[in-house]
UniProtKB/Swiss-Prot annotation:
Assigned keywords, A-Z: Aromatic hydrocarbons catabolism, Lyase, Manganese, Metal-binding
Signal peptide: none
Organism of derivation: Shigella sonnei (strain Ss046)
InterPro entries linked to this entry: 2-IPM_HCS-like, 4OH_2_O-val_aldolase, Aldolase_TIM, DmpG_comm, DRE_TIM_HOA, PYR_CT
Protein's UniProt keywords contain tRNA processing: no
UniProt keyword Zinc present: no
Site (Transition state stabilizer): 14
PANTHER family documented for this protein: 2-ISOPROPYLMALATE SYNTHASE 1, CHLOROPLASTIC-RELATED, HOMOCITRATE SYNTHASE-RELATED
Binding site for Mn(2+): 15, 197, 199
Complex and partners: Interacts with MhpF.
Residues noted as binding substrate in the record, renumbered to the chain: 14-15, 168, 197, 288
Family statement drawn from the similarity comment of this UniProt entry: Belongs to the 4-hydroxy-2-oxovalerate aldolase family.
Protein name in the entry: 4-hydroxy-2-oxovalerate aldolase
């Protein structure tokens, strides 16, 4: 750590959207954002779970627009930066400009781990706006560390000043994380930061985040009570407690985080965010974590096991954006019974 302060990036109000089918009320957003700001996290990501303009038939319709959520958070935040997520092909540079005008000052431009080349326009435009611009390589387990580093180098070349290893499937272990950060550090400029976005499907969200920091990672994503897709993200309050015991500087109020996780966020979960049969299958099969609730819906509709659908999706190497294939897979499984 060398005494540096970790950058704590909360994702409760973006990845956490998946856990409640994108149904946060504006009052939920204000309460959670204020609690995060009071506890002094560095950034608070706000958007539909699938990023700007993710509200759709394919991904699920949100209770509010991205701009309404961003404005609600920006109204109550005094210390943290408001962040948002943009997936090229879903969100556009026009959506990014609107998010900036609503109060977002950080953007994470997210692509599949082998498709960084589609992010050039969005990263360049974010830099023109003056935003803190992050490259976000989703499903990082699906390519080699060396290939991931090449993709990271592309994003850096477009203008991203921080590149994330993103374990969207919660499928990696500590060795996987170390290998990827070493590969990134070997090719990126010394001034380019790195970040870690973990999912907890194998119960390794905190351990993987710690491994990332030990390899020089600058920014850590986490969420209250792990609120996020699948078994959730690295639980913010747990990671901070572990970081504190390691003597790492994080600048946040652990007890305030613990209180907000249990008092504000956990009561909102209509399906517990935890490692269970279905979420473990996500991590074991290496499936995009936000497929969980779509798979459970399809399983109920077609009289199937959600685990069977998830495992088959893993075999077919489906990635984020292919939610429409969940029903196809379910129908194939039903017909092959």
């Amino acid at each position: 750590m060398n005494g540096k302060k970790l950058y704590i990036s909360d994702v409760t109000l973006r990845d956490g959207m998946h856990a409640i089918r994108h149904q946060y009320s504006l009052e939920n957003v204000r309460q959670i954002a204020k609690a995060l700001d009071d506890a002094r996290v560095d950034s608070i990501e706000v958007a539909h779970g699938d990023g700007l303009q993710g509200s759709s038939f394919n991904y699920g319709f949100g209770a509010h627009s991205d701009l309404e959520w961003i404005e609600a958070a920006a109204d109550v935040v005094r210390h943290a930066k408001i962040a948002t997520l943009l997936l090229p092909g879903i969100g556009t540079i026009h959506d990014l400009k609107n998010a900036w005008q609503a109060g977002a000052r950080v953007v994470r431009v997210a692509t599949h781990c082998t498709e960084a080349d589609v992010s050039a326009q969005h990263i360049q435009y974010a830099r023109e706006l003056g935003m803190d611009t992050v490259g976000f390589l989703m499903m990082s387990h699906m390519t080699t560390p060396e290939n991931l580093a090449k993709q990271a180098k592309l994003m850096e070349g477009y203008g991203a000043t921080c590149i994330y290893v993103v374990d969207s499937g919660g499928a990696m272990n500590m060795s996987d994380i170390r290998d990827r950060f070493r590969a990134l550090k070997a090719v990126l400029k010394p001034e380019t930061q790195t970040g870690m976005h973990a999912h907890h499907n194998l119960s390794l969200g905190v351990a993987n985040s710690i491994a990332a920091v030990e390899e020089g990672c600058d920014r850590i994503d986490a969420s209250f009570a792990g609120m996020g897709a699948g078994a959730g993200n690295a639980p913010l309050e747990v990671f901070i407690a572990a970081a504190d015991k390691l003597g790492w500087q994080h600048g946040t109020d652990l007890y305030a985080l613990m209180d907000a996780a249990d008092d504000l966020v956990r009561p909102l979960q209509d399906r517990p965010v935890r490692v269970d049969r279905e979420t473990l299958a996500l991590g074991y099969a290496g499936v995009y974590s936000s497929f969980l609730r779509h798979c459970e819906t399809a399983a109920a509709r077609y009289g199937l096991s959600a685990v069977d659908i998830l495992v088959e999706l893993g075999k077919r190497r489906m990635v984020g954006g292919q939610e429409d294939m969940i029903v196809d897979v379910a129908l194939d499984l039903r017909n092959n019974k």
